[in-house]
Amino acid sequence: MSIELLFCKSQVYIHPTKNLQDNVSGYLLITHQSNSETITSSTISWIPENSLNEEDINFLNNAETRNINEKILRLPVSSRKLNTLLGSGSFLSSNWQFTIPVLSLYSVQFKLPNTWWYGSCILYSKSPRETESIPVLYFHDDLCPSTISKQKELNRSFDPFNNSNEMYWGGQDFKDALGSIVELKRVESEPTFWLVNATLEDLRNFSSANLKSSEEKPSSSKDDGVTKLKEDAWQKWESTKWSLMSQFADITAKTGSFVGSLIKKHPVVQLVERNKNNYYVQKMLKNPKVVEIQDDFDSAKIYLAKWALSVKEEAERYQEGSYDNPYRRILVSEFGLTGNEDVSFTEEELNRAMERNHPMTKQKWNSLFDSEGRLTVTVNEVKDYIFHGGLADDATRKEVWPFLLGVYPWDSSEDERKQLRKALHDEYMELKQKWVDREVNLDNDEEEYWKDQLFRIEKDVKRNDRNIDIYKYNTSDNLPFPEDTAPTTDDDDSIKNPNLKKLADILTTYNIFNPNLGYVQGMTDLLSPLYYIIRDEETTFWCFTNFMERMERNFLRDQSGIRDQMLALTDLCQLMLPRLSAHLQKCDSSDLFFCFRMLLVWFKREFNYDDIFNIWEVFFTDFYSSQYQLFFMLAILQKNSSPIVNNLQTFDQVIKYFNDLNSKMNWRDLMVRSELLFIQFHKTADLLARRQEQLIPENSGHDTSDIEGGTEPKTQSYISEHLQTLLSKEVIIQKENTRTKDSIK
């Protein structure tokens, strides 16, 4: 087993007593198994300098010198050398030397240096007894060569601070190195503490403690008190301002008599737009003739609805991170914590829905696996983490998405996944070769169909996400054309961009894999984000095929799959948002046609790329429901219900309003709302089921003909069949029928 030295720092002391002469100097090390992303073999060691011979001291000093220029060392260390350095290898020897597995750490406390004392580090183990045995480590920065060297470099650049805007000190190097192999989460209520690979439950607990602490924490000095008073006054004003703006937006949406008159090119409207804050203009707006002008313009109502919503959203954006969290009060006001206890959500459920501040990092993901690469926690724990926090970056998504999409089994080992990757690679190449070596089909209809499929694929791929960097230029190197050779359009140009080519190859191979469905417009929208994250043709193909297992129902020729979802959404809207549902019926929009495209390709065209990654990975978890996209859509309806009900009256207005929402929606807010809506729906469904069970015995004696005839009595469910499917986590799979010459192509 090959070991790497990741970190080395000299002049790290232990202070056994108050006497300076008793201080013990030593080296702080972090070791890690080479070519491994798991931390099962990673250790933190402290070795007293007086226990080392000259050769070992020179080795460690040279390692520390390298560590100055290399943030993370990757210095191979033989097992023999490591055993020599660590001695007996026991946890704690008589000379204070210790070695602790990184896996056993619960938290680390970093105390910054000050005028009177050195900066220090305290390691807290998951075992209290072990923690008591680990000495406090003091970083004597005035003696440490690597710290002195880095400090001089920072001084030369006139930047004495680290990336966290804190004064640089030796402990920062240790924290950076440790953070490269584990996830460190700062406890906001106690900023010196950092949790190591914290569980989601720990993060939630410390988050709640932080809220309580921030409200009760006293000021430390008179000056601090003055500063805090000023901050509180400003905070109070900001909170009040946005609260008033939010209320003003509500009032405006209800009256429909102010902002709607500020549009179009009517002279009165232009005058108002330039002088809308003038007292006399405001008085003029109350004139019945001005009100009549507003009523003559349908688009005024759309403008009014969007303005009211934008003010509320701006208020909420401020309030989400404010001192007393008015955003929370907005949610409570809209959803209700009071009333019918059977269907309203609890404080804990509200807190859980709102706490989306802990995305899963690569370090956290790696910490979930043992030395064989097997998951050490339940799949539900992983999905809970992803559902409530998402994934931190694209590198983490590249590792996790194949699990979420079912390419890798959750219970597989690293060796099993390597074998699976090889098998899937071979199978993909075999499928691809079928169309690469394809001969002309003697059946003219089939040959025409194949050519049409290739034409559709190429056409859609060339138009795909051309604002995204890897798809932007249709050149072999994905760089811009020279100005004198740039084509006017891509329409008459073959695909040259290597990434676009791979999209076309994957879609063509999928045509071989699933000949009954073939290619349907919209599939490129589903494939493009997958390839952007995975960047590997074979793995992307299998992620896409598994994704299409659930999405095929959206592309069936008879449209039965998407129709079922639209019917479920209609029932859901009637149950959860009856006022909006009734108003949409008046607007001839009760079929929710404006939601069709959003559901068809999972909101791909309504949000930017980064937002889509976050939205999709939540959907992939099936944490609450395999059709969670319907609750996300319901959240969009709920969010916009008041502006719609109070300002829009026609089908065209509703369509335009929702089309104009593109790239303007806050996905985080919608995820909070969708979770609260699901909780309320689940409780409502349970309540209706209980009421139905109570009614069955009462009616059982009135008609026994069915029982006597040998059949069970029929009972009508209080919740539709479509709504019942929303409570299931099992993915609904609908396959296309066998394609024939008479099939609609």
Swiss-Prot record:
Return one Gene Ontology term, BP aspect: regulation of vacuole fusion, non-autophagic
What's in the keyword line of the UniProt record?
A: GTPase activation
Q: Which GO terms describe its molecular function?
A: GTPase activator activity
Say yes or no: keyword Transport present: no
Q: Which GO terms describe its cellular component?
A: late endosome
Q: Which domain of life is it from?
A: Eukaryota
**All residue ranges annotated as the Rab-GAP TBC domain in the record:** 391-623
**PANTHER family assigned to the protein according to its UniProt record, in alphabetical order:** SMALL G PROTEIN SIGNALING MODULATOR 2-RELATED, TBC1 DOMAIN FAMILY MEMBER GTPASE-ACTIVATING PROTEIN
Q: What does this protein do?
A: Most effectively accelerate the intrinsic GTPase activity of YPT7. It is also active, but to a lesser extent, on YPT31, YPT32 and YPT1. YPT6 and SEC4.
What is the name listed in the Swiss-Prot or TrEMBL entry for this protein? GTPase-activating protein GYP7
Q: Which species does this protein come from?
A: Candida glabrata (strain ATCC 2001 / BCRC 20586 / JCM 3761 / NBRC 0622 / NRRL Y-65 / CBS 138)
